[in-house]
UniProtKB/Swiss-Prot annotation:
Entry-linked PROSITE patterns: HSP70_1 (PS00297), HSP70_2 (PS00329), HSP70_3 (PS01036)
Gene (UniProt): dnaK
Keyword Phosphoprotein included in the entry's annotation: yes
Lineage: Bacteria, Pseudomonadati, Campylobacterota, Epsilonproteobacteria, Campylobacterales
Protein name: Chaperone protein DnaK
A Gene Ontology molecular function term of the record: ATP-dependent protein folding chaperone
Location of Phosphothreonine modifications: T197
């Protein structure tokens, strides 16, 4: 098996790691950084930028710069969180077969395709660092991701050209990185607050076993929400001062987002910061500037209810684990948003103990994913990872009730069967509506998908026996089957849920991504060829001005003609590498006379210098000093 990389595909930033020679280490990207912004931008020239380059141009290109795509991964348009995202994000979120997608310049992209572009960059950076091709990967997801979101994440990996060996939960990966070398069994809590998601997990680690006891969280709570509170405050203050509502100005909103993110970071170490955005907008009276001094206390007042939600969830999860807070040995802080002082204070207060900040909150999840990759590959022996399903799973039964087959907190992989019957006499078909959630009624839970079982033998209601089986694999992805015991008729479905992608569509996206990769490679080669050609043209012009008189007029004319041809092709922005190379070769071939003249001139200069030195030496009179 080739090398296996571990990937933390984050809302704000992503990270990739590799397990080598007994340890897991982060792979820096081509820019030399350990994390890559999860940002994808589409330029007017048709380029696709990923990472830092995409983030840098976001202010000037807000509608075609996609960030926080993880927040709509596997989401249906009719869900509350989708509506919230649509109101918040500057790019266009559209309906694609009922699921969330984004529209860029008239073309629709699924969240899987956008995420795949981030994964492709991580893959390419890993290959450049390792010096070999990489295909196999372990990708992490928030523990509270539902089946649709997990499936969509795996599809993103497939589109990026990766063989996703395993999808594992982020807190579990962090615990694996933290607890691998722990010999004695200890119960720990991983508090994971990232850019867009929150998880809290109680685990038992020790003697190469990492067992999840309970997990919970909110797939729509994170640092982005802290930023949004600050943005709302700035918009409100600006409106009360000027009467102008910045919410209708996408470029202003993008600047506000950047400023809010920076202010949040500054307030993690400073007690006060100033937000200064000159020329944020303009009206009939002229340009307007936004300047606001913000204290840490004011910011904490904006977000205290959000932090409070995470503390409530801590109490629930500890209770689900069947332990008391006194049983917890360590509280491990994971995710960039755990740097916020209020978060640290409240978590510390909740457990009445010092927090464990020994791990890098931005990197530990990827490191754990790489360890899991090494376990699968066989490089790490005797490590047992026991994860759980975060939400209960079941089907809709008579009266719109949810009948649970698998309770939340069940260790995965797992398989469970239950027998149901018909609701009406002589019913020949049933619809199996697969649900995920904790509410009693089907309508209050998430429907992951449904399918029909037909060909049931006619019988009075309650007589037919229909066996429904739920099978969750190690990735937490669900397959459901139904079988009529009398007729033997069976039907099964691997729940695709709201990812909404068929096998054919995924294959098409894989091919499209590969084609774009070729296009990007050609575009990069053309840019490099253009830069080299520009340099050659400049050097040739300089040499002609200095040495042109020292070569025959005929040769000079040929060089000037070839130089003009090269300049002409460089004016064409769409010129390919091959077109540029032809003109570069032509100029190089006719420029040899110029090179000869320069060489002769340099040698002549050297000879003159030597003669001058000799003359000076001849003028020296040897003398002895007594």
């Amino acid at each position: 098996m080739s090398k296996v990389i571990g990937i933390d595909l984050g809302t704000t930033n992503s990270c990739v790691s590799i397990y080598e020679r007994g340890e897991s280490k982060v792979i820096p990207n081509k820019e030399g950084k350990n994390t890559t912004p999860s940002v994808v931008a589409f330029t007017d020239k048709g380029e696709i930028l990923v990472g830092d380059t995409a983030k840098r141009q976001a202010v000037t290109n807000p509608e075609k710069t996609i960030f926080s795509i993880k927040r709509i991964m596997g989401l249906m348009m009719n869900e509350k969180n989708a509506k919230e995202a649509k109101n918040r994000l500057p790019y266009h979120i559209v309906d694609r077969n009922g699921a969330c997608a984004v529209e860029i310049a008239g073309k629709t992209y699924t969240p899987q395709e956008i995420s795949a572009k981030v994964l492709m960059k991580l893959k390419e950076d890993a290959e450049a660092f390792l010096g070999e091709s990489v295909v196999d990967a372990v990708i992490t997801v928030p523990a509270y991701f539902n089946d649709s979101q997990r499936k969509a994440t795996k599809e993103a990996g497939t589109i990026a050209g990766l063989n996703v060996l395993r999808i594992i939960n982020e807190p579990t990966a962090a615990a694996l990185a933290y607890g691998l070398d722990k010999k004695e069994a200890e119960k720990i809590v991983v508090y994971d607050l990232g850019g867009g998601t929150f998880d809290v997990t109680v685990l038992e680690t020790g003697d190469s076993v990492v067992e999840v006891l309970a997990t919970g969280g909110n797939a729509f709570l994170g640092g982005d929400d802290f930023d949004n509170r600050l943005i709302d405050f700035l918009v409100s203050e600006f409106k009360s001062e000027t009467g102008i509502d910045l919410k209708n100005d996408v470029m202003a909103l993008q600047r506000l987002k950047e400023a809010a993110e920076n202010a949040k970071k500054e307030l993690s170490s400073a007690m006060e910061t100033t937000i200064n955005l000159p020329f944020i907008t303009a009206d009939a009276t002229g340009p307007k500037h936004l300047t606001k001094t913000l204290s840490r206390a004011k910011f904490e007042g904006m977000i205290d209810d959000l932090v409070g939600e995470t503390i409530t969830k801590i109490n629930e999860v500890v209770k689900d684990a069947g332990i008391s807070k006194g049983d917890i040995k360590e509280v491990v802080m994971v995710g960039g948003s755990t740097r916020v002082p209020l978060v640290q204070e409240e978590v510390k207060k909740a457990f009445s103990k010092e927090l464990n900040k020994s791990v890098n909150p931005d990197e530990v999840v990827a490191i754990g994913a790489a360890i899991q990759g090494a376990v699968i590959k066989g490089d790490v022996k005797d490590v047992l990872l026991l994860d759980v399903t975060p939400l209960s799973l079941g089907i809709e039964t008579l009266g719109g009730v949810m009948s649970k087959l698998i309770e939340k907190g069940t260790t995965i992989p797992t398989k469970k069967s239950q027998t149901f019957s018909t609701a009406e006499d002589n019913q020949s078909a049933v619809t199996i509506n697969v649900l995920q959630g904790e509410r009693e009624f089907a309508k209050d839970n998430k429907s992951l998908g449904n399918f029909n079982l037909e060909g049931i033998m006619p019988a009075p209601r309650g007589v037919p026996q229909i066996e429904v089986t739920f099978d969750i694999d190690a990735n937490g992805i669900l397959t459901v089957s139904a079988k009529d015991k009398a007729s033997g008729k069976a039907q099964n479905i691997t729940i695709s849920g709201s990812s909404g992608l068929s096998e054919e569509e995924i294959n098409k996206m894989v091919n499209d991504a590969e084609a774009h990769k070729e296009d990007d490679k050609k575009r990069k080669e053309a840019v490099e060829a253009r830069n080299a050609a520009d340099s050659l043209a400049h050097q040739t012009e300089k040499s002609l001005s200095e040495m042109g008189e020292k070569i025959p007029a005929e040769d000079r004319a040929k060089i000037e003609a070839a130089l003009n041809d090269l300049k002409e092709v460089l004016k064409d922005e769409s010129a390919s590498k091959e077109q540029i190379d032809v003109k570069v070769k032509a100029l190089s071939e006719v420029s040899h006379k110029l090179a000869e003249a320069m060489y002769k001139d340099q040698n002549a200069g050297a000879a003159d210098g030597g003669a001058e030195k000799k003359k000076k030496d001849d003028d020296v009179i040897d003398a002895e000093v007594e």
